[in-house]
């Protein structure tokens, strides 16, 4: 198993960094290719991540041809033949996002069987919203032995109100609705850029999806969808991670091809803190002087609020800003596990229900720490850059799910960082 070693204390990042295609966009895009009963679908700007390999294998398991050209960051999918209706447990069980294949398989075949991903229970909010929406469209749902089975000879258009704007549920229902009879309206839909990207692909495939990026989606069902070519949007979370890295190291970094509008919630908090953030022709430039930054209060919310996937990294930034900052997590429960690891590095923090209080500007020391999830992995590495001494970050399987050559990109910006194999 690999580990990352960071020598910190005087790191100051500078230069340019290239952002990959968005992990949170490409996974549902790959699921959408299942719907194309004619021709091939080509996705470009595909990131080389373990989650992408997993989703490719989920789609392959349906007897669909998938060709991943890593050198050119391109995936070609041919789903034009008959496809299977059961997603492979071996791969579905590895990744929560794999549940988004349920809607496309059901819409295409009239029957779908998918194991519950990641061991989550049927009553948990995200899975519940997926199933309620499909039931509203006429599907019969059963759960036996950890498997979800959905049956509908033909899905019917429906009006669906979501109790929470779940990204995954919105994506699943959008895809299912493209081949349903009639019109489907999704109220309180998720508004993330990844939703818009999916809608663009579906429309390029011949679907009729309107309202993406707003709270109300209207999907008029069509008889069939066909292959197309589509470029995956840039990863706003990777871009945000490097913005935070530049800010907390008093750096000067150009995040190439980052999209200002996609990152506006994060940028607004960086500006409030005193970070210099500017849009340039080639991306977003971040300059900072940590000694002049001010503490802030942050609350994670569904888009266009502050992204929960930036919460851990922003905590790392708060740790170096003198004064008392707070960050409230309203999207996911139990997402402060990284703070326990950061306390090993000298972080002073308290957690009261869904809010963490961060006492920033105090000395941090290098330590041996373990990643608890994908974004926590990045946060611990960033903290290691500003802590005195050496930090060793283990359990990198989380990191590889969402960041491509993260340590190499940081090293090119000036970080003293390496990745080594543990004996």
Curated annotation (Swiss-Prot):
Which sites bind phosphoenolpyruvate? 23-24
Q: Which residues are modified to 2-(S-cysteinyl)pyruvic acid O-phosphothioketal?
A: 120
Instruction: Tell me which EC number(s) this protein carries.
Output: 2.5.1.7
Task: Quickly give the catalysed reaction.
Answer: phosphoenolpyruvate + UDP-N-acetyl-alpha-D-glucosamine = UDP-N-acetyl-3-O-(1-carboxyvinyl)-alpha-D-glucosamine + phosphate
Which principal EC class is assigned to this enzyme? transferase
The protein's matches in Gene3D superfamilies, at most eight in alphabetical order, are given as:
Enolpyruvate transferase domain (3.65.10.10)
Its protein name is UDP-N-acetylglucosamine 1-carboxyvinyltransferase 1
Species name: Streptococcus thermophilus (strain CNRZ 1066)
Print the organism lineage: Bacteria, Bacillati, Bacillota, Bacilli, Lactobacillales
């Amino acid at each position: 198993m690999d580990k990352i070693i960071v020598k910190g204390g005087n790191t100051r990042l500078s230069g340019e960094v290239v952002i990959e295609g968005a992990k949170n966009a490409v996974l549902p895009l790959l699921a959408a290719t299942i719907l194309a009963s004619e021709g091939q679908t080509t996705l470009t700007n595909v990131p080389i991540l373990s989650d992408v390999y997993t989703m490719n294998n989920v789609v392959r398991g349906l007897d669909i041809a998938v060709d991943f050209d890593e050198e050119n960051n391109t995936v070609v999918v041919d789903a034009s033949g008959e496809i299977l209706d059961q997603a492979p447990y071996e791969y579905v069980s590895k990744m929560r996002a794999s549940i988004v294949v349920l809607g496309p398989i059901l819409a295409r075949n009239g029957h779908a069987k998918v194991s519950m991903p990641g061991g989550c229970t049927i009553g948990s909010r995200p899975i519940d919203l997926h199933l309620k929406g499909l039931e509203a469209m006429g599907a019969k749902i059963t759960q036996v032995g950890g498997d979800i089975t959905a049956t509908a000879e033909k899905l019917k258009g429906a009006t669906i109100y979501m109790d929470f704007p779940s990204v995954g549920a919105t994506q699943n229902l959008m895809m299912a609705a493209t081949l349903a009879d009639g019109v489907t309206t999704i109220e309180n839909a998720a508004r993330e850029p990844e939703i818009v990207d999916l809608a663009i692909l579906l429309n390029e495939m011949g679907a009729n999806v309107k309202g993406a990026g707003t709270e109300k989606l209207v999907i008029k069902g069509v008889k069939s969808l066909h292959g197309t070519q589509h470029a995956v949007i840039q990863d706003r979370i990777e871009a945000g991670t490097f913005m935070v890295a530049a800010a907390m190291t008093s750096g000067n970094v150009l995040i190439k091809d980052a999209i200002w509008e996609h990152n506006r919630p994060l940028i607004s908090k960086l500006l409030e803190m005193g970070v210099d953030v500017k849009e340039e022709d080639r991306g977003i430039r971040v300059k900072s002087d940590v000694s002049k930054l001010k503490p802030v209060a942050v609350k994670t919310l569904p888009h266009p609020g502050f992204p929960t996937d930036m919460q851990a990294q922003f905590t790392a930034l708060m740790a170096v800003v003198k004064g008392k900052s707070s960050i409230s997590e309203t999207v996911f429960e139990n997402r402060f596990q990284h703070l326990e690891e950061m306390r090993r590095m000298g972080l002073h923090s308290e957690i009261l229900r869904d809010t963490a209080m961060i006492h920033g500007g105090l000395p941090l020391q290098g330590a041996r720490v373990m990643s608890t999830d994908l974004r926590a992995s990045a946060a611990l590495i960033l903290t290691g850059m500003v802590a005195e001494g050496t930090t060793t970050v283990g359990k990198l399987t989380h990191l590889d799910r969402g960041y491509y050559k993260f340590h190499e990109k940081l090293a090119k910006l000036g970080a003293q960082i390496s990745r080594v194999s543990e004996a």
